[in-house]
Curated annotation (Swiss-Prot):
Record-linked CDD domains: HATPase_MutL-MLH-PMS-like (cd16926), MutL_Trans (cd00782)
The protein's name in its UniProt record: DNA mismatch repair protein MutL
Domain of life: Bacteria
Function, in words: This protein is involved in the repair of mismatches in DNA. It is required for dam-dependent methyl-directed DNA mismatch repair. May act as a 'molecular matchmaker', a protein that promotes the formation of a stable complex between two or more DNA-binding proteins in an ATP-dependent manner without itself being part of a final effector complex.
HAMAP family noted in UniProt: DNA_mis_repair
GO molecular function: ATP binding; ATP hydrolysis activity; ATP-dependent DNA damage sensor activity; mismatched DNA binding
SMART domains (UniProt xref): DNA_mis_repair (SM01340), MutL_C (SM00853)
Keywords from the UniProt entry: DNA damage, DNA repair
Biological-process GO terms, alphabetical: mismatch repair
Coiled coil residues, start to end: none
InterPro entries assigned: DNA_mismatch_repair_CS, DNA_mismatch_repair_MutL, DNA_mismatch_S5_2-like, HATPase_C_sf, MutL/Mlh/PMS, MutL/Mlh/Pms-like, MutL_C, MutL_C_dimsub
Secretion signal, residue range per the UniProt entry: none
Length: 596
């Protein structure tokens, strides 16, 4: 027998499933899209054990004709296309005819479907892609698909899946995205028998966004719309004071399909320009309509990436769509001034939802006050130990740290540009960034306290309420024990908020809310070990509590910062990897002046 043999249909389907079906959330995506194509206005999604034990999708769509029940489970069988012309103009979600066959090949699948004006419906069962049962059942209109024991016959695939909690999160994200695409459809999601959310059908996109992300989104959404050259776009973006520290709040749809656009996040960031801090990412919910012949949705097996016939033209359209609204909603004088100002690091949050954003200006400080607007600027008060608070105190060093031998400061000569400390050490001349240096100091201090659990808990005089969505509240409560490992005790308050009644002593009162919001944002949807939690919390505290660029420091504080930095394990980098200091040795200086 020859070495090259034709693969069996079952094996071909399993290989195809590897491209289309990544995990349970991929199954949910494919089946929801089929329901949408069938005209469903109501959809129930159920999962158990992250979708690996059970997935059930029930809809009230048009159903499948009896003669099409069996072909529906065959590969490359579809009702959407007949020739290449149909493929070029396809507007439906599922058109390749691979989804059901791929899902069936790696699971135990039961399909029930009925159509109008029929007394009976049909049920068909498949095990690993092979039909095991087919029978008539009492009639109904719609389709029910039950997927059990996903990847039962491909154990290697199952082994590489993440935890149940992670898979649950991916399913919720999939349903959320589909619910944004179709605000006119009612969605219900249940996981392990618990209702996650019920989304009634809505008349407009904004109400659906508010349903999913919280009522406090309503006042921070800017409506965008543009029609030009065969392209039409509508949707919402967040105002410049409303942003996240990651890109998880960005949703783009083309012809109703959730997609990833090449350079999409970069274009969005460019459109906001200097209205956002470097680590700020706006929310967007953008819906594009375009002639199907001008876009290729067939680039990726899962159809999540697309390609435009005129990429450059689309990119220009995208920028215009966003910038037009930002310019019209923000006074021109403010925009022009903002570009000339030194942006301060955000210190306060305007909102408290995980899906909400941070205020980009300091509390009690006008964003328009700049050194460029005045010839004389009053000198700021010098830092003192009391102002810096117990967590950031530069008082006595702990006994369990060792001085770092490579950076031993002898004296300092002041501060350049209210940012860079000039100092002499045993091995040369140093320029030290006061913010990143203090950030490194605070990071290592807090990390030591967390690792040794050497910190107290202090009650708050006034508990802090944090508004979240129902889904976010569930995520937080599921990780309650993890958060308590870093001294964060959050309790439910109603169905859409949590309350903070006490904080760890390594936090300075007044900054705890923004630190905790930052921490929750950074851990959202991530699997984290205890050391990783400590690292993330220490970074959040360090970032928020460190001395800022432009803060005036007294000579004793300067000396103490340098002394503290010399005791750090890694004095040359801040926790985020930026340099804290630059060294010029005596040899470097002599070579620069041609003395050597």
């Amino acid at each position: 027998m020859g070495k090259i043999q034709e693969l069996s249909p079952e094996l071909i389907n399993q290989i195809a499933a590897g491209e289309v079906i990544e995990s349970a959330h991929s199954v949910v995506k494919e089946l929801m899209e089929n329901s949408m194509d069938a005209g469903a206005t109501q959809m129930d999604i159920e999962s158990k054990d992250g979708g690996l034990s059970l997935l059930r999708i029930t809809d009230n769509g048009s159903g499948i004709d009896p003669e099409d029940i069996e072909p529906a489970l065959k590969r490359h069988a579809t009702s959407k296309i007949r020739d290449y012309g149909d493929l070029e103009n396809v507007l439906s979600y599922g058109f390749r005819g691979e989804a059901l066959a791929s899902i069936a090949s790696v699971s135990r699948l039961t399909l029930e479907s009925g159509i109008k004006n029929q007394k009976t419906a049909w049920k068909i069962c498949s095990i690993g892609g092979k039909i095991s049962e087919k029978e008539e059942i009492p009639g109904f209109v719609g389709t029910k698909i039950l997927v059990e024991e996903l990847f039962f016959n491909t154990p290697v695939r199952r082994k590489f899946l993440k935890s149940v909690r992670s898979e649950d999160k991916k399913i919720r994200d999939r349903v959320t995205t589909q619910a944004l695409a179709r605000h006119d459809v009612r969605f219900r999601l249940f996981q392990d028998g618990k209702e996650v959310f019920v989304l009634p059908s809505r008349e407009n996109k904004k109400d659906r966004i508010v349903d999913l992300f919280g009522e406090n989104f309503r006042d921070h959404l800017l409506e965008v719309s543009l029609e030009r050259g065969g392209l039409n776009a509508t949707g919402y973006i967040s105002d410049p004071d409303f942003y996240k520290s990651n890109r998880t709040g960005q949703f783009v749809f083309v012809n109703g399909r959730p997609v990833e656009i090449k350079y999409g996040s970069t274009l969005l960031k460019k459109a906001y320009d200097e209205l956002l801090p470097p680590n700020g990412h706006p929310y967007c919910f953008l819906f594009f309509e375009i002639d199907p012949s001008r876009v290729d949705v067939n680039v990726h097996p899962a159809k999540k990436e697309i390609r435009f016939l005129d990429e450059e033209g689309f990119n220009g359209f995208f920028l215009t769509l966003i910038q037009k609204e930002l310019r019209s909603s923000t006074p021109v004088s403010f925009l022009e001034l903002k570009k000339r100002l030194l942006r301060p690091t955000p210190e306060t949050f305007k909102t408290s939802s995980l899906y909400q954003a941070h205020s980009s200006s300091r509390s009690g400080e006008s964003p328009l006050l700049s050194r460029e607007l005045f010839t004389e600027v009053p000198r700021q008060e010098g830092f003192d130990l009391d102002r810096m608070g117990p967590g950031a105190s530069l008082s006595a060093l702990t006994d369990n740290v060792v001085k770092h031998s490579s950076f031993v400061p002898k004296k300092h000569f002041g501060v350049l540009f209210e940012t860079f400390i000039l100092a002499e050490a045993e091995d040369g001349f140093y320029i030290i960034d006061q913010h990143t240096a203090h950030e490194r100091i605070r990071y290592e201090e807090v990390l030591r306290k967390l690792e040794k659990k050497n910190y107290g808990i202090q009650p708050l005089l006034t508990p802090i309420r944090i508004d979240v969505s129902k889904q976010e509240q569930e995520d937080i409560l599921n990780r309650k024990k993890e958060y308590e490992e870093v001294g964060i005790f959050l309790d439910p308050l109603g169905e859409d908020s949590v309350v903070l009644r006490e904080i760890p002593a390594y936090m300075e009162p007044g900054e705890e809310k923004e630190i905790i919001l930052d921490f929750l944002n950074r851990t959202e949807g991530k699997e984290t070990t205890e050391p990783e939690l400590y690292d993330l919390m220490a970074k959040c505290v360090a970032c928020r509590s460190a001395i800022k660029k432009g803060d005036h420091l007294s000579d004793p504080i300067l000396a103490e910062i340098l002394n503290r930095l010399s005791y750090c394990e890694n004095p040359s980098r801040c926790p985020h990897g930026r340099p804290t200091l630059v060294k010029l040795s005596r040899d470097d200086l002599e070579r620069m002046f041609h003395r050597k």
